Design a protein with these regions (language model features):
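Charged alpha-helical initiation segments
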Residues: 1-62, 76, 91-93
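Helix-loop junctions and short alpha-helical segments
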Residues: 63-64, 71-161, 166
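Short alpha-helix boundary/capping elements
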Residues: 68-72, 178-181
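Polyanionic, low-complexity intrinsically disordered segments
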Residues: 2-30, 34, 153-233
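Amphipathic alpha-helical interaction segments
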Residues: 29-30, 69, 73, 88, ...
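Charge-rich, acidic-biased intrinsically disordered regions
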Residues: 36-44, 83-102, 198-208, 225-233
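Short, charged/polar micro-motifs that form catalytic or ligand-binding hotspots
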Residues: 46, 50-66, 163, 170, ...
Length: 233
């Protein structure tokens, strides 16, 4: 099983965790979830107030954004792990990947690079990748398309009818995540604009989109599309 298979497995597990939270939000909004308070030895059920409900809905955007960013980071990492495991040398990879590696090397310490290099044609590929430099809080549909173009994998997914939804949802998730992360807006303010049902619809659309992107990257790796086609005999 290739590295991308583990990425897909992790994505499915994380998606399931996120789904459970969104179902909880739906139950909460429908009054199926209550707080149990003990008063003088007696338990009393109280409906959760709207402000707390909105705060919890605001947190949903962080879960969605983390799902998107972690999935894309892990998928890109799988490409480089494939190159390392198959000992693919720098001169054999496609020009787009060469550019990425060379740009990444600009910020590296030359002394540390020399410490790690034994075979420059192979080691430069692994040294020229840093997972933590990918998608630092700014991922949306535009960046995913640009990343696909940079690496050479397909950014189109099967569900073309919902392209506008995907674009607007990804932008909404990114903007809300950044507002929350930077303290620009309170969680309750972010959460009050959507119902739980609307959030579930957003989640379903994003999960299906990410599945399609992962399938495209899996095809890219399986078909060795990371190789320079001009080197193919």
């Amino acid at each position: 099983m290739g590295r991308i298979s583990f990425v897909i497995q992790d994505f499915n597990e994380l998606s399931e965790e996120v789904s459970k939270y969104f179902i909880f939000l739906q139950d909460l909004e429908q009054g199926k979830v209550k707080l149990i308070k003990e008063i003088q030895g007696n338990n009393k059920a109280n409906k959760i107030d709207v402000e707390l409900e909105n705060t919890l809905k605001g947190s949903a955007y962080l879960l969605l954004y983390n799902l998107i960013e972690s999935t894309m980071k892990n998928a890109i990492e799988a490409i480089f792990q494939e190159l390392q495991e198959k000992d693919v040398s720098f001169d054999k990879i496609r020009p787009e990947l060469k550019k990425i590696i060379l740009v990444n090397l600009k910020g590296r310490n030359p002394d540390k690079i020399l410490e790690k290099i034994q075979d420059i044609s192979l080691d430069i590929v692994s040294i020229g990748f840093n997972k933590e430099e990918l998608f630092t809080g700014n991922i949306d549909s535009k960046l995913i398309r640009e990343t696909a173009k940079k690496y050479g994998f397909d950014s189109q997914t099967d569900d073309k009818k919902r392209t506008n939804d995907k674009i607007s949802y990804l932008r909404l998730i990114k903007n809300n995540r950044n507002d929350l992360a930077h303290g620009n807006r309170p969680f309750g303010d972010v959460g009050k604009s959507k119902t739980a049902d609307e959030l579930i619809e957003i989640k379903k659309t994003i999960v299906e989109y990410l599945k399609g992107i992962l399938e495209n990257i899996e095809t890219y790796i399986d078909n060795e599309e990371y190789l320079d086609s001009t080197n193919t005999p």
